[in-house]
Every structure is written in C-alpha cells, then in structure tokens.
Amino acid sequence: MTNQTQMMEFLLVRFTENWVLLRLHALLFSLIYLTAVLMNLVIILLMILDHRLHMAMYFFLRHLSFLDLCLISATVPKSILNSVASTDSISFLGCVLQLFLVVLLAGSEIGILTAMSYDRYAAICCPLHCEAVMSRGLCVQLMALSWLNRGALGLLYTAGTFSLNFYGSDELHQFFCDVPALLKLTCSKEHAIISVSVAIGVCYAFSCLVCIVVSYVYIFSAVLRISQRQRQSKAFSNCVPHLIVVTVFLVTGAVAYLKPGSDAPSILDLLVSVFYSVAPPTLNPVIYCLKNKDIKSALSKVLWNVRSSGVMKR
C-alpha cells in the first residue's frame, strides 16, 4: 500500500495489550458511554418538554447536550467494539467520517461555549435587558454560525488529510481517527492544506478564547461590585465551572493538535485525547445541570407525572 487510494483500512491503537485490562477498558468505556448518553438525552428531553427551559441559556445547553451526545458516539462505540472483538481495524470510509465528525463536533462545541459565556455576561451585566440582548434570533444565528464555520473547516481538514500519500504502515497512534495521528503516516512533504486548516482552526479557537476572557473580565468586575456575599458566591459558582470546562477543553485540544509528534503513542497522548473527546460529553451534564434548580424541578415534575400516570392505570 503506497497511497491513500490503496489504503482500505487503518489500525487503531489499543490502550493495553493485556486481555483482562482490554476487557476492563471495554467495560469502563461502556459505562461512561451509557452514562453520557442517558444524561444528555434526559437534558434534551427536559428542555423540550418544559416551557420554563426555553430561555437562551437552556437553548445553548440543549444544543451542547446534542453535540456531546454526537461527539462521544463518534469515537467511543468503535473503541468498545474493537476491545470486545479483539480487533483494531477501522475502514477507510469509516475513518474519513470519524475524522470529519470529530472536527465538526469538537469545533462547534467551542462555539457554543463561547456563546454561553456571552449569555452569562448578558445575564449578569445587563439583567434588565438580557432577553432583548439574547433574543431567539441571535441565539439561532450564533448556533448556525458555529455549525457552518466548523462544517467548512471539517471538510477542509478531511479533504486535506486524505488527499495526502500514506506510508505502507496503516497503524494509527490513536484510539480514533484524528488529524495528528494520520499525519504521522503520510509520506507527503507538503501539508499546505493541513497547515492552512490548522492556522484557521487556531485563529478560530483563539478568537473564541478572547471573547470568553473578555466576557468573564466584565462578569467578574460586575460580581465584585455586588454587596451581598451570598449573591456573589452564587454568581461565582455559576461561572467558575463553565470557565474550567472551557479551559480544559481548549488546552487539551491545543496540546493534541500543536505538540510535536512522536514515533510511538504514550499514555499521555491517549489521556489528552480522552480529555477533549470523552470527558466533556460525560462531565458537562453534571457541571451545568446538577445544581440547576430549574432542571431539577423539571425532572421532578416529569417523574411525578410518570408516577401519577402509572398509579392511574392501576
């Protein structure tokens, strides 16, 4: 196999060669995946069913849950299947689709997190005009811009990557198809399209980071002017988790895409990939919704209705 037209499949790296640990990995990833899917589906359904959860903040949370659901479904099930079936292969077309989805979904998540920071700025710094500032039309426009931007960049990344010539080796140093891992297999010296794609991606991520930082500078300035300690504490508790999520997501993504490549995968490389592809979809529902009174109230209402309907049938 000398180029990508003859490359029929790729081999994904295993977390371990030990048979017992491989099954343990499959079990752990299965639990993580089922937990993430269940939590994100519940959040989406609650926000659709309860009219109180139709504000801008919940609009973004609903779409974030949808993105998280898609992102973890793009990578984890294949890793679980390979561990259970004791195989490492992924088809060429499967790799193309997986790469496109990861770039699209991860990038769109950055856009949503940026929009959420602006929504928090509007809620804290302009509380009387929040609904006017974060109108339904603006929310839809921000969402569409994020999807279109990352969709175009995803196509550019995917087309640029698979237009390159590959070595005879088809072993990826990653548990899913990702640009850095694929570039290690290429024998092409010129990566012009990829270089342009990375530059655009870095500019996009940096501009999102700047918007988030500026929003939080205004937010923390406004919070520090609040006289009541209880209200200050509540505002900080709502904002700090979001800031932590953004920081971890951007830092791990930057490390994965910008650090120099190595000849063999390290456990650190795999952990970094887990942090930006598996951890966010699992942790976001907990971070954003566990202490949210409106969501807890909506869940209690749904459970009560289900229980009441069951009693009535009896």
From Swiss-Prot:
Entry keywords, A to Z: Cell membrane, Disulfide bond, G-protein coupled receptor, Glycoprotein, Membrane, Olfaction, Receptor, Sensory transduction, Transducer, Transmembrane, Transmembrane helix
Segments on the Cytoplasmic side according to the record's topology features: 45-52, 119-131, 216-235, 291-314
Pfam families in the record: 7tm_4
CDD domains: 7tmA_OR14-like
Residues bearing carbohydrate: 3
Principal localisation: membrane
Localization (cell): Cell membrane
Membrane topology: Multi-pass membrane protein
Molecular function as annotated in GO: G protein-coupled receptor activity; odorant binding; olfactory receptor activity
Keyword Chloroplast carried by entry: no
One Gene Ontology CC term in the entry: plasma membrane
Transmembrane listed as a keyword: yes
InterPro entries, sorted: GPCR_Rhodpsn, GPCR_Rhodpsn_7TM, Olfact_rcpt, Olfactory_GPCR
Family: Belongs to the G-protein coupled receptor 1 family.
Job description of the protein: Odorant receptor.
Entry protein name: Olfactory receptor 14K1
Species whose genome carries this gene: Homo sapiens (Human)
Biological classification of the source: Eukaryota, Metazoa, Chordata, Craniata, Vertebrata
